């Protein structure tokens, strides 16, 4: 995630955005090109209100003050945060922090949104609601989504293609159905091959 978004630079290989090499680009240039991210631990402007957090992102993307305020209102309504608009970001519940991170990303009119473990710290009851947020980014805002997470249910529900890593190495890649049937994935998930049926059952609970 850090390498793709320009917070770190690779020792080898290259990063491309829609066929154009951007390996040497700093993070702010990648952001202007439409490649934005959310963070695992918020990175909110905690001294600002919820609305101001989104306005700042829109202003940074070139919107005027009035347009930024309107955009913030639209996005907070979309993500169910309108009632929290004037609250300090510092006192938001964890799930709402995640939504605010997505709202800030969308305020920049991105082409791609990268989400770093967005389900970390969420209660299981909050995951389906956040899955709807991810789908809205893709379907309503026409932005591609790259999502990294350990929550199998979220991954299976929202991803069209899945790339599974084990100890930093590619273990499998494919559609959710292909991953469900991959014995290497189920073995790595629990660490024992006899656990395959249990893992497949967990992966398919929501089907």
Regions found by a protein language model. Give the residues of each.
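Glycine-rich phosphate-binding loops of nucleotide-dependent enzymes
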Residues: 1-207
């Amino acid at each position: 995630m850090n390498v793709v978004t320009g917070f770190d630079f690779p020792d080898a290989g290259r990063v491309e955005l829609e066929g154009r090499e951007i390996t040497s680009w700093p993070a702010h240039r990648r952001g202007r090109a439409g490649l934005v991210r959310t963070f695992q631990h918020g990175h909110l402007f905690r001294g600002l209100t919820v609305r101001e957090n989104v306005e700042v992102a829109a202003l940074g993307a070139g919107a005027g003050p009035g347009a930024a305020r309107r955009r913030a209102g639209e996005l907070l309504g979309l993500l169910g945060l309108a009632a929290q608009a004037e609250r300090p970001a510092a006192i938001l519940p964890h799930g709402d922090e995640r939504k605010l991170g997505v709202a800030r990303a969308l305020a920049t009119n991105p082409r791609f949104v990268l989400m770093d473990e967005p389900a970390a710290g969420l209660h299981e009851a909050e995951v389906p609601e956040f899955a709807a947020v991810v789908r809205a980014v893709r379907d309503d805002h026409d932005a591609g989504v790259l999502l990294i997470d350990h929550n199998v249910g979220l991954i299976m529900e929202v991803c069209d293609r899945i790339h599974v890593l084990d100890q930093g190495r590619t273990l499998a890649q494919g559609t959710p159905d292909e991953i469900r049937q991959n014995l290497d994935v189920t073995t790595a998930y629990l660490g024992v091959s006899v656990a395959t049926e249990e893992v497949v059952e967990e992966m398919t609970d929501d089907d």
